[in-house]
Amino acid sequence: MAAEVIASKGVPVTVYERKATLGRKFLLAGRGGLNLTHSESMDRFLARYGAAAERLRPAIENFSPNDLRAWCEGLGQATFVGSSGRVFPESFKASPLLRAWRARLENLGVKFIFQK
């Protein structure tokens, strides 16, 4: 996400990836349906972080679960709230989200260097 924010300001960005492909862990996380976030209130959401909640509050409030959903929508990846309150992409897959994100990054001029 940092690469996207910086590149959107016109700053050249190069992402160095240790693996041979982009988003390997992201794709693995998506194998179970890609639970992106939760739809509960901010206070309840923060309570999940235990003792670290107050330290993390400014960062999470700066990019909230609703902001994450809007970001996905901006990539053309609609989300929905499941019966558990968890938020998922409508596709239930990580790969469409990753492809859309990579396309956005490349359109912003972000370069990728992968481990050979």
Protein language model features and the residues they cover:
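Short glycine-rich, polar/acidic loop-and-turn segments at beta strand-coil junctions
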Residues: 17-20, 40, 75-76, 116
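Feature captures the FAD/FMN-dependent oxidoreductase FAD-binding
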Residues: 61-116
